[in-house]
């Protein structure tokens, strides 16, 4: 089920041991189209059960949306070693689930994702949410983990097209251009 040149449905995953965000986009046309997003909320305190819930949730998403490729965020260095280890375990669980479904997995660093979606690798979560909403033409702002997962899927879409930055999706007003340093979340 790998997508060699014909992949149109991409699943982005923002792994976590408590909340795993997901975002599904269709890239059949040059402009990515929103399909779905949300969060897998982990209800257990036991590690094995947490990982089983991540695996089951990702498996359910794969069955429902039939993605051709999966993109996931790479582990970033954390000051808290325990948190980084738990994140790595959740991430590994998602990768194994994808592999067991015959899907190719693509990995992107957090700074690559922010750069691709916002134009700067130092973007805040709010800036990522704002740009994901604008790029996909969403009516509302997705929850942070879901927005991150959509940003991961968009990053993969842009990488597949050989682009590093997204095209402008909003109407451009003459004489006005929004800059990130001017953006203030509501």
UniProtKB/Swiss-Prot annotation:
Active site residues of this protein: 14, 73, 145
GO molecular function: crossover junction DNA endonuclease activity; DNA binding; magnesium ion binding
One Gene Ontology term, aspect cellular component: cytoplasm
Cofactor binding note: Binds 2 Mg(2+) ion per subunit.
Cytoplasm among keywords: yes
GO BP term, pick one: DNA recombination
Highest taxon, organism lineage: Bacteria
Catalysed reaction, written as an equation: Endonucleolytic cleavage at a junction such as a reciprocal single-stranded crossover between two homologous DNA duplexes (Holliday junction)
EC number(s) recorded for this UniProt protein: 3.1.21.10
Compartment list: Cytoplasm
Location of region: Disordered: 162-186
Binding-site residues, Mg(2+) 2: 73
Pfam family, one: RuvC
Keywords: Cytoplasm, DNA damage, DNA recombination, DNA repair, DNA-binding, Endonuclease, Hydrolase, Magnesium, Metal-binding, Nuclease
Keyword check for Hydrolase: yes
Function in brief: The RuvA-RuvB-RuvC complex processes Holliday junction (HJ) DNA during genetic recombination and DNA repair. Endonuclease that resolves HJ intermediates. Cleaves cruciform DNA by making single-stranded nicks across the HJ at symmetrical positions within the homologous arms, yielding a 5'-phosphate and a 3'-hydroxyl group; requires a central core of homology in the junction. The consensus cleavage sequence is 5'-(A/T)TT(C/G)-3'. Cleavage occurs on the 3'-side of the TT dinucleotide at the point of strand exchange.
NCBIfam families (UniProt xref): ruvC
Name this protein carries in UniProt: Crossover junction endodeoxyribonuclease RuvC
Protein species of origin: Chromohalobacter salexigens (strain ATCC BAA-138 / DSM 3043 / CIP 106854 / NCIMB 13768 / 1H11)
Organism lineage: Bacteria, Pseudomonadati, Pseudomonadota, Gammaproteobacteria, Oceanospirillales
């Amino acid at each position: 089920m790998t997508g060699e040149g014909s992949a149109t449905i991409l699943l982005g995953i923002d792994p976590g041991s408590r909340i795993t965000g997901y975002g599904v986009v269709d890239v059949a046309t040059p402009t990515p189209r929103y399909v779905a997003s949300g969060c897998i909320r982990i209800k257990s305190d036991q590690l094995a059960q947490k990982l089983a819930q991540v695996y089951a949730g990702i498996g359910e998403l794969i069955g429902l949306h039939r993605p051709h490729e999966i993109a996931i965020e790479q582990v970033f260095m954390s000051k808290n070693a325990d948190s980084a280890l738990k994140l790595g375990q959740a991430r590994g669980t998602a990768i194994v689930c994808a592999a067991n479904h015959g899907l190719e997995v693509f990995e992107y660093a957090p700074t690559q994702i922010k750069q691709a979606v916002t134009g700067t690798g130092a973007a805040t979560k709010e800036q990522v949410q704002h740009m994901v909403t604008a790029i996909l033409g969403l009516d509302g702002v997705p929850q942070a983990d879901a927005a991150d997962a959509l940003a991961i899927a968009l990053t993969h879409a842009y990488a597949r097209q050989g682009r590093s930055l997204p095209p402008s999706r909003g109407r451009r007003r003459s004489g006005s251009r929004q800059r990130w340093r001017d953006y203030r979340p509501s």
